[in-house]
Amino acid sequence: EEVGQAWIASFFHMVIVVSGMRYKRWILPFLLFAAALVMSMQVLAVPQALPLANRAYVIDSGHGGKDDGAQHGDVREDAINLAIAREVRTLLIEQGASVIMTRDGDHDLAGEDVENRKREDMQQRVAIINCGWADAFISIHLNAYTSANVHGAQVFYQEENAASKQMAQQIQQQLSASTDTKMSAKPGDYYILEKPSVPGVLVECGFLSHAAEREQLQSESYQKTLAKAIVDGVIAYERYEQ
């Protein structure tokens, strides 16, 4: 009986965070349905006074596994993305939201034998976002540029989606208040923004190519600052949408 209970707990943990294995296409919808069912039951226990009660989000931590993303020496984007994404998840849950992570470990979402890993990885991320459970998504990334002087967090959105634009502007406003970024929210031509069926944003949390910002991005305290700004922006967006 204990083994059975442990298996069930492990299964639902795997479903909720959507990590730890490579999904075949036919099983992903089933896993997402199970996750949505569990999350819907959890929502009943959330205090309704919390600002994000009854709201559900997908947090997409960019890159992972064989795809490190941007790099500077031994500093890897994918690891920092995941650290920030986990902080965002924690804060969203504290505010009453339900959360699914596209990944919660050092892996991508492509199968082992897939030739075009990047395409498969992105398709799986979008499939998770489009599961029918989420109200919105947030994709976490870091930037890099040929000039070492460029720095600052910046939020991107799909140009024709008014809700995504509003979310991006609210998050950018909070990032500007919490960090020294001078960037503005702007439209972005990214697969992760074009294909989902719900509003969402891509947050470039800073530049690994900028020495001072690179040091900040590796700091747990700065990661928490970024996460809080993102979640404060989400709360402001939800209030605006009401």
Stretch-by-stretch model annotation:
Residues 2-242:
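Catalytic-site microenvironment of enzymes
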